[in-house]
Amino acid sequence: MYFDIKAFLDAQTQELTQRNPAVEKRVELRGGQIETTRVPEVDWSKELQIFYQADINKPALRGAYAVDSVAKGDTLRRTYSRKTGIDNAVERITVLSVVATPAVAQEITATLTQDNPLFFSQKRVMMHTTDGRLSDYQVKGVQKLVLFDTLRYSAAGRVLN
């Protein structure tokens, strides 16, 4: 069984919906100027939707990822890497956790790639927690459609208390 990102995100969504914090968002498109805005109310189920794409804890993907674990002090870094020949968008997920009972994820990063003759897309999603609560998140990506320019983008959010 891999890291249960769905359960993690469901718990974060529930906690954030109850707490209802504002978010500071930063967006950059095509290497242009960074736009920053404060959003007072957020629909957390929609806001975190892209992170659900990193869910590899499905019966069809059992055995599809190699797991590498490195413990250092009170932290554990576990990386799930897609095995060669496996057709799934999630290339890699890394979860940094504090070893406790239960373990608490501090950082989650995932790389999602889609590549076919007409379209290439790669997204790197990242989130951090403080005391088990989401503190910030980020999505960086690139898209390339045949005959069109490459689009690079990044979006980040910081949860305000």
Residue ranges and their predicted role:
Residues R77-N161:
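Gly/Pro-enriched, hydrophobic low-complexity segments
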Residues L16-V99:
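Surface-exposed acidic loop/strand-edge motifs in secreted or periplasmic proteins
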Residues D10, E15, G63, Q114-N116:
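Generic ordered-secondary-structure signal
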